[in-house]
Amino acid sequence: MYALLSVYDKTGLLELAKALTSKGVKLLGSGGTAKMIRESGMEVADVSSITNAPEILGGRVKTLHPAVHGGILARDIPSDEKDLVEQSIEKIDIVVCNLYPFRETIAKPNVTIPEAVEEIDIGGVTLLRAAAKNHARVTILSDPADYATFTDKFLSDKLTQDDRNTYALKAFASTASYDAAITDYFRKQYAAGVDQLTLRYGANPHQSPAQAFMEQGPLPFKVLCGSPGYINLMDALNSWPLVKELRENIGIPAAASFKHVSPAGAAVGLPLSDVEKKVYFVSDITEFTPLACAYARARGADRMSSFGDFIALSDTVDVCTARIISREVSDGVIAPGYEPEALELLKKKKGGKYCVLQMDPKYVPAEIETRQVYGISLQQHRNHAKIDFSLFEKVVSKNKDLPKSALIDLVIATTALKYTQSNSVCYAKNGMVVGLGAGQQSRIHCNRLAGDKADNWWLRHHPKVLGMQFKKSAKRPEKSNAIDLYVLDAVPAEGSEREQWESAFETIPEPLTKKEREEFLATCKDVVCASDAFFPFPDNIYRLAQSGVKYVAAPGGSVMDQAVRDTANEFNMVFSEIPLRLFHH
């Protein structure tokens, strides 16, 4: 029985060699490994004794030879046995190998590419893969931490095929990890900005280093301006498929306003009424494109949440849309293209540091997606559920009248849920998200949050709000905040906050009375609501009714499904049971 030893990390080497020789195993060693064993007084043959070839190229070629790999890869079958006899090759039953310290080398400051290259192990990786491939016969030890357990079993003749299987898996994992480190290093050296993008830091400033990269080929987006951060890319790469799918499934340009990996707003480009233009702060614009309408709606749905958003647009960005973006506070935008004048407008934001990404509209992500949580890799099939009009065909309520306008809103609300942190509930109306409750552990709390946002959105249409007279010096965020406090009935009666609120106005508006609020909210009708999972109790339906919801979409599966449907029937709602749960994390 032969064992081949070729290690960089010589931890435990001599103890292992001693155990092997005590059982009559003949040792073969390469270079420094053989030297260390020999100097300890044990007998070991150099690899060159079976290859009849010396180490060459300064040690770059030591074990790459048919006499070595034939002995490792040979199976216990007649044809392989015949080949070994004809070539005078002995079988090798045990391989002990670990690799040059590539990771440790590149971690050193100011390491050069030639220095890194010299730590790329070739023969070692080949030994590991060859022995692991033939693990039906060969034992491969790639980790010194396994020597003691192996020795105990080997000396007591208790080494099993299961042990060889485990060692082989570890060897394959070792070579995969090693190659990944090499690829990562050279990706940064030779494909920075193409296959790889170095980020300032991760989710927080202390989480450095950080990067975005593709394992195969170039990144599907180009940075046209600015420097995207980790959170920017999380928002961009979650919001882009949302608008892409809305465009494909509804046929109208779409926009999304993202904050912290959930949409603050999403919409398609339905024309804006004069009232809506006032509500969304675009009444001074005379000409609108569908894309501009889409972003005005997406941004205007929840202006407080959209402050500092990342924008996704389904179509080439035109000048009209760029002008709306240019006067709002946002972090960046992703779109399939930009008109030259529009791009120049966007490049002026943030003193030239505004993040502008151009997405490849033909890019299709891999079917299997992987992420790490606390060092554990989780893998799943990508959520490629198609959300179009056909999804809502199963109507389980007595009222089955689903007009085209409601179907459009259902597609918008449900698609938004697909890219919203769960649990989530979404209200939509007029081609846009009007209230979204995300990331709550309780569905009723999601529902209340979404419903309250929808109520606030509708109250911003109130004549008292539309008639507010702001000072010319009042900035857009100040106006948004003042309106938000007003419609929430949260303006303090006195004090510095009250003074600050009043300072935005030429004329202090009269407060909305409880009666005015209730009467105006009662005029909001035909609202759509979608849920990313079933409604567990009828209390959700009662909350929907408070905000004028007429059309509901949610999956079934609760023991209370019938009670929920019965309650929806009490309010003459149209309830579509969809065959999808849409959790997103």
UniProtKB/Swiss-Prot annotation:
Pfam assignment, any one: MGS
Family from the record: Belongs to the PurH family.
Protein name in the entry: Bifunctional purine biosynthesis protein ade10
GO cellular component labels: cytosol
Listed EC numbers: 2.1.2.3, 3.5.4.10
Organism: Schizosaccharomyces pombe (strain 972 / ATCC 24843) (Fission yeast)
Residues reported in the UniProt entry to bind (6R)-10-formyltetrahydrofolate: 444, 539, 558-559
Originating gene: ade10
Start and end residues of each MGS-like domain: 1-142
